[in-house]
Design a protein with these regions (language model features):
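Low-complexity, intrinsically disordered segments enriched in Ser/Thr together with acidic residues
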Residues: 93-113
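A surface/secretory-pathway sequence property marking extracellular, secreted
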Residues: 60-86, 133
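Extracytoplasmic/periplasmic copper-protein system
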Residues: 20-29, 125-147
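Hydrophobic h-region of N-terminal signal peptides that target proteins for export
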Residues: 10-18
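Serine/threonine-enriched low-complexity regions used as flexible
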Residues: 113-127
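Low-complexity, serine/threonine/proline/glycine-rich extracellular segments that form mucin-like
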Residues: 27-67
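Bacterial N-terminal signal peptides that target proteins for export
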Residues: 1-6
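Short, solvent-exposed loop/turn segments enriched in Ser/Thr/Gly
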Residues: 34-39, 100-101, 114-117
């Protein structure tokens, strides 16, 4: 019975973790204020069809400096009037039962606080899953604590 409980708990945790996440390269959700950090966006496919586009909204105060090339994906960047990156879109295919990682370097805000990374995942049928905290229990955004 205990093995069943542990297996069930592990399975539930894996489902809870199966969403688009932004973490530091070391895999944490914490970083230092003003620090240059390498972040990774991890995007799993949760449907029986390919993901065709990923849109990442950059939190205010984060300064993106460069991206790692992601084979099979074209990247477009939107900047504000000051030249700061506000949004990144990657287009390509992530097939069912696959995931993709997108790495980028950024400088954290100098003030401590909470970064909310909003991710919009588009599937081949045009449907979009909004990992943006509009439904935190179902589609949570990724958060980074800047200390």
């Amino acid at each position: 019975m205990q093995k069943f409980f542990m297996l069930s708990a592990a399975l539930l945790l894996s489902f809870a973790a199966a969403h688009a996440t932004v973490r530091t390269e070391a895999g944490t959700s914490e970083s230092a204020a003003g620090k240059s950090e390498t972040y990774r966006l991890n995007v799993p496919v949760e449907k029986d069809m390919a993901t065709t586009q990923i849109r990442l909204v950059i939190p205010a105060g984060v300064g993106i400096s460069r991206f790692q090339v992601t084979p099979g994906f074209a990247r477009t960047v939107t900047k504000d009037a000051d030249g700061l990156v506000t949004e990144v879109v990657w287009k390509g295919d992530i097939e069912p039962m696959e995931y993709a990682r997108f790495f980028f370097q950024a400088v954290n805000p100098v003030q401590p606080g909470e970064l909310v990374w909003k991710v919009y995942q588009t599937y081949a049928d045009g449907s979009v899953v909004a990992w943006d905290d509009t439904q935190p229990d179902k589609t949570p955004a990724s958060h980074t604590t800047v200390k």
